[in-house]
Amino acid sequence: MQHNRYLKWFAVAATVGMLLILLGGALVTKTDSGLGCGRNWPDCNGSLIPKEITPEVLIEFSHRLVTGVVSISILVLTVWTWRKLGHIREVKLLGFLAMFFLIAQALIGAAQVLWGQGDFILALHFGISLISFAAVLLLSMIVFEVDRKFDADNVFIGKKLRWHTIAVTIYSYLVVYTGALVRHTDSSLICPDWPFCYNETPLASPNNMYEWVQMGHRLAVLIIFIWIAYITWHAVKEYKNQRVVYYGWIIAFTIVFLQVIAGMLVVLTKLNLTVALMHSLLISLLFGLLCYMIMLVARSNYNEKMK
């Protein structure tokens, strides 16, 4: 029992650590601190520990340090869960995904520092980190036996909800990419108004690539908001007796609603840093929850085959 308690605490620490990596990367982008350590990696401006500390150096170096520490903790968590919970079907795959995509995002970050990358490649950085976070989050939920508390092992999801769950999760990744592209192309404030680029001329076409990027992201968000609202309505109507599905989609709709509000406030507050980081946090939580719903779909399929 004592070992299980330690594993739970460690899983929480690893999950929080992955969130810090995500938010740290967003902070690096939003403060334009990506070259705070110059074109040097893994050292910072020619030394292991930076000698001259500026805000940009502090942000970039801290992000690298957190990534290194969390990478080790996730490796430990992966091995630990493999040994203790390897009998649970998803554990080994989730551990592999967590490590693989964490290494991938670190390599993309290093490549950006050493050689520079295009905006469309850089936009993948956040999304790749997000997959690693989702894997660690699901591992933690398994460690805490969330499934047993909500009787998720016996869940049954109909074909309609299965299709919508898989499709909206894949689509959410596209939404994440468009949001990251907004950041990396410096298009966050290209449109001064909300919900249209210019509220005085709401039907006007975008004038340049940056407005297309910004308005394309807003359109993508509108679609996912309506989509998740519909799925939530369906889940509330048809799955009242399956708490994990019922409450899962209610939480998903709450998060996507808050995400839309945060996106609006990013524009209205002229890219306030706290609001912008909250925007990144909410999409991370939403994607993690959608991935959990995917795991429930997989379990439902397995339960159906075993009958």
Curated annotation (Swiss-Prot):
Species per Swiss-Prot/TrEMBL record: Lysinibacillus sphaericus (strain C3-41)
Cofactor: heme b
UniProt subcellular location: Cell membrane
Top-level EC class as recorded in UniProt: oxidoreductase
Taxonomy, superkingdom: Bacteria
GO biological process: heme A biosynthetic process
Cytoplasmic side: 1-8, 78-92, 145-161, 240-247, 298-307
One GO cellular component term: plasma membrane
Active site residues of this protein: E60
Protein name from the UniProt record: Heme A synthase
Subunit structure of this chain's protein: Interacts with CtaB.
Family of the protein in this entry: Belongs to the COX15/CtaA family. Type 1 subfamily.
Biological pathway: Porphyrin-containing compound metabolism; heme A biosynthesis; heme A from heme O: step 1/1
Binding site for heme o: H63, H125
